[in-house]
Amino acid sequence: FATATLDYGTQVLWPDHCVQGTDGAALHRDLTLAHAQLVIRKGYHRHCDSYSAFVEADRNTPTGLAGYLRERGIERLFAVGLATDFCVAWSALDARQAGFAVAVIEDACRAIDTGGSLAKAWSDMNAAGIQRGISAEF
């Protein structure tokens, strides 16, 4: 993948994906959203990408998710999704740094695994004290 240097550092230029307003960005039709109180949208700032659900890629702009969870007394998070080595890992690491207990459910994730990125992500998450398991364990 190509990269670009932005104000906040090097950014990977991913192929277009999860474009707002397309099926690729839509929540699954079988997902029950009647009780959803918050949807965090990320990666929509033109000049700043976003891997984490907690902090934009500039590492300075919070999404508000940590405060939202704290206000509701939530202390433990389960991370799932795409891609394990980027969005899931960054979100899990930022959640851990914000003081949450975090578990990544491995069989509910999928990685890109480019240039050893998956091994590095698991190593970083392990070093941060993030639990790793499969869905049957939770």
What role is predicted for each listed range?
Residues 1-76:
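Active-site alpha/beta core segments
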Residues 96:
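Gly/Ala-rich phosphate-binding loop of Rossmann-like dinucleotide-binding domains
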Residues 42, 105-107, 135:
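Generic beta-sheet signal
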Residues 74-90, 104-110:
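Glycine-rich anion-binding loop/nest that anchors nucleotide
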Residues 3, 8, 17, 100-108, ...:
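Feature captures the catalytic ectodomains and active-site-proximal regions of enzymes
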Residues 26-38, 113-138:
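Structural recognition of alpha->loop->beta junctions
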